[in-house]
C-alpha cells in the first residue's frame, strides 16, 4: 500500500504543479497503477479499469458542453441579461441581478461558460457608467461557482457525485423524504446575495440599458430546457433486470445529453447547409476535462484496490471520532480550505470513496447513510473555490477577461468580495444541510 500511496501523492502533486498537462499526468498515473496490477503488486486488470470508467458521466458532460455552446451562439444569454438590466433602478441592483442570472444559468450550465455568457454585459454596463468592471465580474464569477452544486447538471463535481452515488437529477431537489442540496445552495445564495447588496451599497448611479441583442435561434434554449426535463423524467425510469436494456439504462443521462446535443448540431448544419456547425460544436468540447475524468476513474480505482481509500477513511474516522457532526464539520472545513487553492475536480473524485468508507465506519462500525457527508463535501469543495482568485476555473476566466480588457486585478480586490460571499454561503448552506439531514 505504501508504494500505491506514494505514487498517488506524486501524481496528484504533479497535477497541481503542471496544470496545463493535468489530463496527461492523470493518464500516466492510471497507466502506472495498471502496470502495478500487471506485475501482481495487487489485483487490478485492464477489465477492472474499463469497468471503473463511468461512461454515463463522460457522455453527459460532453453532451452538455455541446448544447451549451449552441445556447451561447444563439445569443439568448445576452438577451436575457439585457432584458433584466433594463428594469432595474441603479448599479447596485444591476450587479445583484447579473449575479442572480449567472447563478441561475450556472445551475444548469458549466460555470466557465456562464461567465463567458454574462461577463460581456457586466463589462458594457461598467463602461457606460465609467465604473471599474473588476468587482462586477468578480461578483458574476463567484455567483456562478456557488450555484454549480445546485443540480446534477450544474458542475463537473455534481456530475461526479451523481455518478458515484447513483443519484439522479431529482435527488438533488428531494431525496429520501428530505430536501436535497439544491435548497441549501439556494439558501446560501440568498445569504451571499445580501452580502453583494451590502458591498455595492454606494453604487446607486441610475442604469439605462436598451435591449439590442437579437436572438438568432430559439431552438438551443428549447434543447437546454428539454435536456433538464428529460433528465428529470429519466430519474423515474424503472431499472431493467439485465441485457442491452440495462446497459442503456446505466447510460440514460449521457444518452439524453449527447442525443440532444447531436440533434442541435445536426439542425444547425441543416440550416446553414454546411458541416461547419457540427465541427464547431465538437471543437467546443473540453477534451482536457473529459480525458482528466477518464484517467481519474482508472487512477482512483487502482488506489482503491491497493487499500489506500480504506486507510484514508480510517484516518478521517480517527480524527472525527464516531460523532456525525464532527465528521460533517471536518469535511466541510477541509473542503473549503483545500478547494481555495487546488482544483476541486480531482479533489472531489478522490474524496467521494473516502467519504463512503468513513460513513461505513460510523455508528460503531454498523455504518450510517453517507448522503449528508456527500452533500457536505460538495458544498465545501464548490464554495471554497470562491475564497481565492485561483480557486475555481470561473474565477480564472473572469480575471482573464478583465486583463484582456486592460484591467488590473489585485488579490485584495477579489478577497474583498470572495471572502464574505463564501463565509455567508458556507455558513447558511452547510448549516441548513445539517438541519435537513443531520438532526
What residues fall within each predicted segment?
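Alpha-helical transmembrane segments of multi-pass membrane proteins
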Residues: 91-104, 130-147, 172, 177, ...
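Membrane-embedded alpha-helical segments and adjacent helix-loop junctions characteristic
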Residues: 47-134, 289-364
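Hydrophobic transmembrane alpha-helices of multi-pass small-molecule transporters
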Residues: 1-73, 79, 175-314, 409, ...
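Peri-membrane helix termini and adjoining interfacial loops of integral membrane proteins
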Residues: 32-43, 75, 159-167, 203-204, ...
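Re-entrant/interfacial helical elements at transmembrane boundaries that shape
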Residues: 80, 113-124, 137-138, 151-167, ...
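Membrane-core helix-loop-helix motifs of multi-pass transport proteins
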Residues: 125-221, 365, 369, 374, ...
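Residues that define the loop-to-transmembrane-helix transition and helix capping
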Residues: 23, 56, 92-93, 134, ...
Amino acid at each position: 500500500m505504501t508504494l500505491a500511496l506514494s505514487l498517488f501523492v506524486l501524481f496528484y502533486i504533479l497535477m497541481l504543479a503542471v496544470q496545463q498537462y493535468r489530463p496527461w499526468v492523470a493518464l500516466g498515473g492510471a497507466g502506472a497503477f495498471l502496470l502495478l496490477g500487471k506485475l501482481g503488486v495487487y489485483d487490478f486488470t485492464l477489465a477492472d479499469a474499463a469497468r471503473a470508467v463511468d461512461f454515463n458521466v463522460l457522455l453527459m458532460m460532453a453532451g452538455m458542453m455541446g448544447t451549451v455552446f449552441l445556447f451561447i451562439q444563439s445569443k439568448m444569454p445576452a438577451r436575457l441579461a439585457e432584458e433584466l438590466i433594463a428594469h432595474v433602478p441603479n448599479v447596485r441592483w444591476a450587479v445583484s441581478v447579473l449575479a442572480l442570472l449567472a447563478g441561475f444559468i450556472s445551475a444548469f450550465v458549466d460555470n466557465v461558460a456562464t461567465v463567458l455568457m454574462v461577463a460581456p454585459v457586466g463589462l458594457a454596463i461598467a463602461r457606460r457608467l465609467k465604473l471599474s468592471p473588476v468587482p462586477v465580474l468578480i461578483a458574476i464569477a463567484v455567483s456562478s461557482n456557488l450555484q454549480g452544486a445546485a443540480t446534477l447538471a450544474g458542475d463537473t463535481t455534481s456530475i461526479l457525485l451523481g455518478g458515484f452515488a447513483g443519484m439522479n437529477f431529482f435527488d438533488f431537489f428531494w431525496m429520501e423524504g428530505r430536501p436535497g442540496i439544491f435548497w441549501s445552495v439556494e439558501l446560501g445564495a440568498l445569504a451571499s446575495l445580501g452580502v453583494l447588496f451590502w458591498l455595492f451599497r454606494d453604487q446607486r448611479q441610475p442604469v439605462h440599458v436598451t435591449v439590442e441583442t437579437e436572438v438568432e435561434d430559439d431552438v438551443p434554449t428549447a434543447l437546454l430546457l428539454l435536456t433538464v426535463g428529460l433528465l428529470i423524467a429519466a430519474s423515474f425510469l424503472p431499472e431493467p433486470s439485465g441485457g442491452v436494456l440495462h446497459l442503456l439504462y446505466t447510460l440514460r443521462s449521457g444518452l439524453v445529453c449527447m442525443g440532444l446535443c447531436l440533434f442541435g448540431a445536426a439542425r444547425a448544419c441543416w440550416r446553414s447547409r454546411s458541416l461547419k456547425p457540427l465541427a464547431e460544436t465538437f471543437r467546443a468540447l473540453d477534451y482536457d476535462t473529459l480525458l482528466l475524468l477518464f484517467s481519474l476513474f482508472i487512477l482512483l480505482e487502482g488506489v482503491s484496490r491497493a487499500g489506500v481509500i480504506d486507510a484514508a477513511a480510517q484516518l478521517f474516522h480517527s480524527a472525527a471520532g464516531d460523532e456525525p457532526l464532527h465528521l460533517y464539520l471536518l469535511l466541510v472545513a477541509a473542503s473549503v480550505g483545500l478547494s481555495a487553492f487546488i482544483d476541486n475536480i480531482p479533489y472531489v473524485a478522490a474524496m467521494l470513496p473516502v467519504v463512503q468508507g468513513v460513513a461505513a465506519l460510523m455508528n460503531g462500525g454498523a455504518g450510517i447513510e453517507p448522503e449528508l457527508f456527500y452533500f457536505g463535501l460538495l458544498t465545501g469543495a464548490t464554495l471554497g473555490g470562491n475564497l481565492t482568485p485561483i480557486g475555481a476555473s470561473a474565477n480564472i476566466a473572469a480575471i482573464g477577461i478583465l486583463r484582456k480588457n486592460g484591467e488590473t486585478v489585485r488579490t485584495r480586490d477579489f478577497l474583498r468580495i470572495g471572502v464574505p460571499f463564501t463565509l455567508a454561503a458556507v455558513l447558511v448552506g452547510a448549516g441548513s444541510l445539517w438541519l435537513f439531514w443531520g438532526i
